């Protein structure tokens, strides 16, 4: 059997895929082809990656196979990449007679198996596999009737590898083989060396450039093997000495006192008692080869029973006979091992297990030697487990592995915790064991293993060193990505980040709102990704763990110049893969390209390029096409322009000839009519014309010229039509190109046939041909397509503008510890890494999303947010990629780069929206599928009907045929007339205009919306928005700003007793420890009033939910003193301002502009007892509330403003009212929506009083208050059941289910606060007037779609009957070229109609405001209908979920701060069956 060792991989771009069905079709069809091992098609990347056998397939044949399926396949790189393979040696242990042919046929049918070699005499199979497709476990499952044992040449640490391969009398040899470039080299080497007598097995690794050989030294020598390899043209060097079971000469020389065993003795080694164990620190080990050298050399000493070497810990544990050898001798033995560069020291860990060790040996040992065996613990993430059987299977297999102390696998959390001996096994080995069982196992990214000291001896010091403690407590970091849905604004992001950081085991959280993704760093020993996702779900969001989410971020494609041979490739690959954080590196010498996968948190693209540069090569990014050429249709425009000009060049003479012949025909017809000329004379005069003269019998000059001019147009101008028509017919479909090809081909073929017949019959009368039809058809069709693509390019201008905003370069700066600029570097924007400091100069574009760290400026964000006015930026402000810096230079820290930037997400959103189909378009596409066959049938029917009519009543044809001539026969006249009518029917029918009606309008509509800061996710919401009858607003964050602010501070004590500034300082300090939103608002207000960022000290802080807080405050004197100094400074400034013409200095300074009298500067630190809360909290603490204060709180509560009381040292000092203010444009937006005939509803989880107050301010008369999250969905559904289309507008956590349930979900954001998952329509700006604009734009777009459908309907319903000759009696008739012109005009008119949407402008709200000012106004509370809870729907409501319970408790807590006298604890404690 010829081995097929070569396996290649090629990636082919595939255009034309629209759904998953296309992907499956390609994978199934191509996957069945001979020689295909694996195929993976990506709809997102529009590519197919195929692993194949180059002997059976080539990239070109694969491309053609995909082309034949009707897709456009493009091969960017014709040079395939080699695919790594591995060889499994499977030893058969069964004793029965083996069906070798059966095994071979079974395995060869398996995907991923490339070659099988059978050695019946050795009962062994060598199976070559592609590890990325199939693994050893799957191979063994394919032959269940046989018990197979893996004796494969897998890479294992230590001597275990070698001894598992070598039987008695056999030796393992490793030889370095250089110059191998492909798998053909490895297979050739294995084939020739494996045939040598004495060679039992051989495995050649292309990656490591080495050969591992098991041979019998009595049959063949090392030199002979080396010579045979070099004879094949590969330089060979012995990498390791053969493992004879005796010491080498140099070791004997250095260990003269140690007896050396003979070869015979080595095969039956005596078992010595293990008296002691010593741990040595070995410096100088670099790789597994060093480990293997030491482990293979030291056990040859007579008194050493075992050794385990750890490369990670740079240590070795040796068990030996203490009565015969000392640790010092073992140190010398290790240092003598080749290459003799190891530095060995004892780690003071010698365990004596002998019952009576000799006193001499004990004296040689250090006095402080202790017993301290090491145990480490690792966590392995395991996916693919489905039941407890999987858990028991993993625990059973792994626990049997050497070095494993214990294992516990958690099915719920999908991870396993393994306690193991690091000197006997490693985490990677354990992971591979689990993978071989068929599960996916991933090790967390750990910087330092957690070391546990087990069973310390009595001599162990009680106080370990600090360093040991540090090593034990080193945190293990892992990273996961979680897809989060339902986020609508920055408060959602802050909520998730704040709550996750509180959970044990989570180090950091970064949430990207635009991408809907959270990046979490965590300790895998404490918490796992599924648990983190559950925490997020408990917060009210949808959350799923993203598998392999970090792969997309860490893929780098480079062009590497300067490589000359395979050695250069190996040098780059080996150097890069040694770097931490680089998972994979593949360099192709032929294409000079490198493909690298890396962890962006550990290493960045600039670091990788610098590393390659340090090797002496030049590396640069593969330039991506950042242009919008695919949007402006430049290639298609150029193609159709060329086609039009070619057709026009040849068509112009044809049209001239046709017009000349028509004029001459008219001239002779006039003579015939006036002079009563006979038919014979008519024919004679007609043939006397120059163009009608015959060159050959039956062939006139006119027909010859027409044929010559028609040929290039037919086959060059129409080439594209033929290709598209062929592909359509091949897949049993029909499109516009089929109609065009049918019309032109039939006309050309008909004319050519009758011309050949006339020449064959040597006819004296020239036949009437239609060679003029194809050129004229192609001219008008090419012109129409050219104009159509120009117009289509205009429809995507908005998206092209967004893409053009992306910066191409960034200036990265380096700062020192004092933020002083050290250096600047100009890099490609794709090389920017998160955390980079970027400098943006005035007029420059922001290359990435970031946060300002230094500088002040104004930024133009108009092209992204639609906001015309520049936005001020200062340190701490966020900036959006693509916006333009105006005045000052800024330093920003990159937070989101690459595909995660806001601009990239907006571009992606608009692209997806413009390719989505509206429901009306789906109907049009379905209609278009039946249109072409219907037109073909009509055309055939027209041909047959007119032939029948002509033979029945020739007078009709004679009367209405414009080109009738008595010089031709009746039969020819009838056939020509019928043929012309049928061709015209084919030409005028146009399904294109029907198909263009909706997508062009959707493209323009979504593009115009994006330019105005309104992102509409596709055609369906764009079409649905105009049907909306009810608009439901959430209150918090939508109608209101969503952040409470202090509305009023009322001081209830005299100022000389406690000044207002002192009350603010105490209250601000007390509330600074509170996490309640009202507490944060109070703290912010106090800091602003006192003009400070620091407050006093708060101790004994306690919070009672639903009541208030208590604490003790100190250290506010310095704060007050600082405030007094500012007051004095301001007073001085104000006094100097009024010293105009002042004579008396005393009088001039007594100005009324002095703010306050200076307060006494207290220097003694005083402690204040503080209570802040509602009336119930004050009453609990024994305070009496006066009627005036009580009335004031009731008044605030009626207006929806929570009010809290403040006591200092048991004295009521102040009242603070807090409110969530209404947005200024809310009232106007509500009024405009009502004037458009829409019903406006307010739905909120807040209490009825607050809801009524807010509704009265904005003019909403219908309110649903105290609605729980799950009930918002039920209420939207209830409105829908009433037959109303509902639009839900919101931005909060609890709004996302209702947004999904509504017919149109609208999410409001601010700047970068744009949701992707939760809504159908997204506003980049936080402006309620955009709700009006989105509905108005939807109405305009749908109106335009309806107009667009009108054009093709008129063309086809009127044009087809005219073309078929129905209206001949009234003189309406079309020639074929007229039909093609009309068809082209229909498509162009539809696209031009859609372009009128570009004239759309958002309504002028200034005019709206002027026009509606007299009509708008606040509603009185009596006019507002407030419904509490879900009203009549409560009977069918489910029990409250976890989120609803949390919200219920929170509401009770917040509402209890209102002025209502009754306690709301009953609401919390009672079972909320009534949902109110």
Curated annotation (Swiss-Prot):
Where on this chain does Cu(+) 1 bind? 18-19, 22
UniProt keyword terms in alphabetical order = ATP-binding, Cell membrane, Copper, Copper transport, Glycoprotein, Golgi apparatus, Ion transport, Membrane, Metal-binding, Nucleotide-binding, Phosphoprotein, Repeat, Translocase, Transmembrane, Transmembrane helix, Transport
What SUPFAM superfamilies is this protein classified in? Calcium ATPase, transduction domain A, Calcium ATPase, transmembrane domain M, HAD-like, HMA, heavy metal-associated domain, Metal cation-transporting ATPase, ATP-binding domain N
Q: Domain of life here?
A: Eukaryota
Its EC number(s): 7.2.2.8
What is a single molecular function from GO for this protein? ATP hydrolysis activity
Quick one: which residues bind Cu(+) 3?
Answer: 287, 290
Query: How would you describe this protein's topology in the membrane?
Result: Multi-pass membrane protein
Q: Where does Cu(+) 6 bind?
A: 565, 568
Under the cellular component aspect of Gene Ontology, which terms does the record hold? Answer: plasma membrane; trans-Golgi network
Report, as the record phrases it, the tissue specificity of this protein.
Answer: Expressed in most tissues except liver.
List residues modified as Phosphoserine. Answer: 338, 352, 356, 361, 1420, 1422, 1450, 1453, 1456, 1459, 1463, 1466, 1476
Catalytic reaction annotation: Cu(+)(in) + ATP + H2O = Cu(+)(out) + ADP + phosphate + H(+)
What is the name of the protein in this document? Answer: Copper-transporting ATPase 1
Cytoplasmic compartment spans: 1-642
Among CDD domains, the record links this protein to: HMA (cd00371), P-type_ATPase_Cu-like (cd02094)
Mind telling me which PANTHER family this protein's record contains? P-TYPE CATION-TRANSPORTING ATPASE
The residue ranges of the HMA domain are: 8-74, 85-151, 171-237, 276-342, 376-442, 478-544, 554-620
Residues reported to bind Cu(+) 2:
182, 185
What's the top EC group for this one? translocase
Catalytic residues (positions):
1034 (4-aspartylphosphate intermediate)
Record's family? Belongs to the cation transport ATPase (P-type) (TC 3.A.3) family.
Q: Where in the cell is it found?
A: Golgi apparatus, trans-Golgi network membrane; Cell membrane
Q: Which residues cross the membrane?
A: 643-665, 695-717, 736-760, 770-788, 930-952, 978-998, 1347-1373, 1379-1397
Q: Which organism is it from?
A: Cricetulus griseus
Q: Report the glycosylation sites.
A: 674, 685, 887, 953, 1130, 1134, 1448
């Amino acid at each position: 059997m010829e081995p097929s060792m070569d396996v290649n991989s090629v990636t082919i771009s595939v255009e034309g895929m629209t759904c998953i069905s296309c992907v499956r079709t390609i994978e199934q069809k191509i996957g069945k082809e001979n020689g295909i091992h694996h195929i993976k098609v990506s709809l997102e990347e529009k590519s197919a990656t195929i692993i194949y056998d180059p002997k059976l397939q080539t990239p070109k044949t694969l491309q053609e196979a995909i082309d034949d399926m009707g897709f456009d396949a493009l091969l960017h790189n014709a040079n395939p990449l080699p695919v790594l393979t591995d060889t499994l040696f499977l030893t058969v242990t069964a004793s029965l007679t083996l069906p070798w042919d059966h095994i071979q046929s079974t395995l060869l049918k398996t995907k991923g198996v490339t070659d099988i070699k059978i050695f019946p005499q050795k009962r062994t199979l060598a199976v070559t596999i592609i590890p990325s497709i199939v693994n050893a476990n799957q191979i063994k499952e394919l032959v269940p009737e046989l018990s197979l044992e893996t004796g494969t040449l897998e890479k294992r640490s230590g001597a275990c590898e070698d001894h598992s391969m070598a039987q008695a009398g056999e030796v393992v040899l490793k030889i370095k083989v250089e110059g191998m470039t492909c798998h053909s080299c490895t297979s050739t080497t294995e084939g020739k060396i494996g045939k040598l007598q004495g060679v039992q097995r051989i495995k050649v690794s292309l990656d490591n450039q080495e050969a591992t050989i098991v041979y019998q030294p009595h049959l063949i020598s090392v030199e002979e093997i080396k010579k045979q390899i070099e004879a094949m043209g590969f330089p060979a060097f012995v990498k390791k000495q053969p493992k004879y079971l005796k010491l080498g000469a140099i070791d004997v020389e250095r260990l003269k006192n140690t007896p050396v065993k003979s070869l015979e003795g080595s095969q039956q080694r005596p078992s010595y008692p293990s008296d002691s164990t010593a741990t040595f620190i070995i410096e100088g080990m670099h790789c597994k080869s060093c480990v293997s050298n030491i482990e293979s050399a030291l056990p040859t000493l007579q008194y050493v029973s075992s050794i385990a070497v750890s490369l990670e810990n740079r240590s070795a544990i040796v068990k030996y006979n203490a009565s015969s050898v000392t640790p010092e001798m073992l140190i010398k033995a290790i240092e003598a091992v080749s290459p003799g560069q190891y530095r060995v020291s004892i780690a003071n860990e010698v365990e004596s297990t002998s019952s009576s060790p000799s006193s001499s040996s004990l004296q040689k040992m250090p006095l402080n030697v202790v017993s301290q065996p090491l145990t480490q613990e690792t966590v392995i993430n395991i996916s693919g487990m489905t039941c407890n059987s999987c858990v028991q299977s993993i625990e059973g297999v792994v626990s049997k592995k050497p070095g494993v102390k214990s294992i516990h696998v958690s099915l719920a959390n999908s991870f396993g915790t393994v306690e193991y001996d690091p000197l006997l096994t490693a985490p990677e080995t354990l992971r591979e064991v689990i993978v071989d069982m068929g599960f996916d196992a991933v090790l967390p990214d750990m910087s330092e293993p957690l070391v546990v000291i087990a069973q310390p001896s009595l001599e162990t010091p009680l106080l370990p060193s600090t360093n040991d403690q540090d090593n034990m407590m080193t945190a293990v970091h892992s990273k996961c990505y979680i897809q989060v849905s339902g986020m609508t604004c920055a408060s959602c992001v802050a909520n998730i980040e704040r709550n996750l950081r509180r959970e044990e085991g989570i180090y950091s959280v970064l949430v990207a709102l635009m991408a809907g993704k959270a990046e979490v760093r965590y300790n895998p020993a404490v918490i796992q990704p599924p648990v983190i996702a559950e925490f997020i779900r408990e917060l009210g969001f949808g959350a799923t763990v993203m598998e392999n989410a970090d792969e997309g971020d860490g893929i780098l494609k480079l062009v590497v110049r300067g490589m000359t041979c395979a050695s250069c490739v190996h040098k780059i690959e080996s150097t890069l893969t040694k770097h931490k954080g680089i998972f994979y590196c593949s360099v192709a010498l032929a294409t000079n390209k490198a493909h690298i996968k890396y962890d962006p948190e550990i290493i960045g693209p600039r670091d990788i390029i610098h590393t390659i540069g340090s090797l002496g090569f030049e590396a640069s990014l593969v330039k991506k096409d950042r242009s919008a050429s695919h949007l402006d249709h430049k290639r298609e425009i150029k193609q159709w322009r060329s086609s039009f000009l070619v057709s026009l060049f040849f068509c112009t003479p044809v049209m001239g000839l046709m017009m000349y012949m028509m004029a001459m025909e008219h001239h002779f017809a006039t003579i015939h009519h006036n002079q009563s000329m006979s038919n014979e004379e008519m024919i004679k005069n007609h043939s006397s014309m120059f163009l009608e003269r015959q060159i050959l019998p039956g062939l006139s000059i006119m027909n010859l010229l027409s044929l010559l001019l028609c040929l290039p147009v037919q086959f060059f101008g129409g080439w594209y039509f033929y290709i598209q028509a062929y592909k359509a017919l091949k897949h049993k479909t029909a499109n516009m190109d089929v109609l065009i090809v049918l019309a032109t081909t039939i006309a050309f073929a008909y004319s050519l046939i009758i011309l050949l017949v006339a020449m064959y019959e040597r006819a004296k009368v020239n036949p009437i041909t239609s060679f003029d039809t194809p050129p004229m058809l192609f001219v008008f069709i090419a012109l129409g397509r050219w104009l159509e693509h120009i117009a289509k390019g205009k429809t995507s201008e908005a998206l092209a503008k967004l893409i053009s905003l992306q910066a191409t370069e960034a200036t990265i700066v380096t700062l020192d510890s004092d933020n002083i600029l050290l250096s600047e570097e100009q890099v490609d924007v794709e090389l920017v890494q998160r955390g980079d400091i970027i400098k943006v100069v005035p007029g420059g574009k922001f290359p990435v999303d970031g946060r300002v760290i230094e500088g002040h400026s104004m930024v133009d964000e108009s092209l992204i947010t639609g906001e015309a006015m520049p936005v001020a930026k200062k340190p701490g402000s966020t900036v959006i990629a693509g916006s333009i810096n105006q005045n000052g230079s800024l330093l920003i820290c990159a937070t989101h780069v690459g595909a995660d930037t806001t601009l990239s997400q907006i571009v992606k959103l608009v692209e997806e929206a413009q390719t989505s189909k509206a429901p009306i378009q789906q109907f049009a596409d379905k209609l278009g599928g039946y249109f072409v066959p219907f037109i073909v049938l009509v055309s055939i029917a027209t041909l047959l009907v007119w032939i029948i009519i002509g033979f029945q009543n020739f007078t009709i044809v004679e009367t209405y045929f414009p080109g009738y001539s008595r010089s031709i026969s009746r039969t020819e006249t009838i056939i020509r007339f019928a043929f012309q009518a049928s061709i015209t029917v084919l030409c005028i029918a146009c399904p294109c205009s029907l198909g263009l009606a909706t997508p062009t309008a959707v493209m323009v509509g979504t593009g115009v919306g994006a330019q105005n800061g309104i992102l509409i996710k596709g055609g369906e919401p764009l079409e649905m928005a105009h049907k909306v009858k009810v608009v439901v607003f959430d209150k918090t964050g939508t109608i209101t700003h969503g952040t409470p602010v202090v509305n009023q501070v009322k001081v209830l004590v005299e100022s000389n007793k406690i000044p207002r500034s002192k009350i603010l300082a105490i209250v601000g300090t007390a509330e600074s420890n509170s996490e309640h939103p009202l507490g944060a608002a109070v703290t912010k207000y106090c800091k602003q009033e006192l003009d400070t960022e620091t407050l006093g000290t708060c101790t004994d802080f306690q919070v009672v939910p639903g009541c208030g807080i208590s604490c003790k405050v100190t250290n506010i004197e310095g704060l007050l003193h600082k405030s007094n100094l500012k007051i004095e400074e301001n007073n001085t400034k104000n006094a100097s301002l009024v010293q105009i013409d002042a004579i008396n200095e005393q009088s001039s300074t007594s100005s009324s502009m002095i703010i306050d009298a200076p307060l006494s500067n207290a220097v003694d630190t005083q402690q204040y007892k503080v209570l802040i809360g509602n009336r119930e909290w004050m009453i609990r603490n024994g305070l009496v509330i006066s009627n005036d204060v009580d009335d004031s709180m009731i008044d605030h509560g009626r207006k929806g403003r929570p009010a809290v009381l403040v006591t200092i040292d048991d004295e009521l000092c102040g009242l603070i009212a807090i409110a969530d203010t209404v947005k200024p444009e809310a009232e106007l937006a509500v009024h405009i929506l009502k004037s458009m005939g829409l019903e406006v509803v307010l739905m909120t989880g807040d209490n009825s009083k607050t809801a009524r107050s807010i509704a009265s301010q904005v003019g909403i008369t219908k309110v649903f208050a105290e609605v729980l999250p799950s009930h918002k969905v039920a209420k939207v559904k209830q409105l829908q059941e009433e037959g109303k289309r509902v639009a839900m507008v919101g931005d909060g956590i609890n709004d996302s289910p209702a947004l999904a349930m509504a017919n149109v979900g609208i999410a409001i954001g601010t700047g970068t606060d744009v949701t992707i998952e939760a809504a159908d329509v997204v506003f980049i700006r936080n402006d309620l007037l955009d709700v009006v604009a989105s509905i108005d734009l939807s109405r305009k777009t749908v109106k335009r779609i309806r107009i667009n459908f009108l054009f093709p309907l008129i063309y086809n319903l009127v044009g087809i009957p005219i073309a078929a000759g129905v209206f001949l009696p009234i003189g309406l008739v079309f020639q074929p070229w007229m039909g093609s012109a009309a068809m082209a005009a229909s498509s162009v008119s539809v696209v031009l109609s859609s372009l009128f949407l570009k004239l759309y402008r958002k309504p002028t709200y200034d005019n709206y405001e002027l026009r509606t000012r007299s009509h708008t106004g606040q509603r009185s509370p009596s006019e507002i209908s407030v419904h509490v809870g879900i009203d009549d729907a409560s009977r069918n409501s489910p029990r409250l979920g976890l989120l609803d319970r949390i919200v219920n408790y929170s509401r009770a807590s917040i509402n209890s701060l209102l002025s209502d006298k009754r306690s709301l604890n009953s609401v919390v404690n009672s079972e909320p069956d009534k949902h109110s």
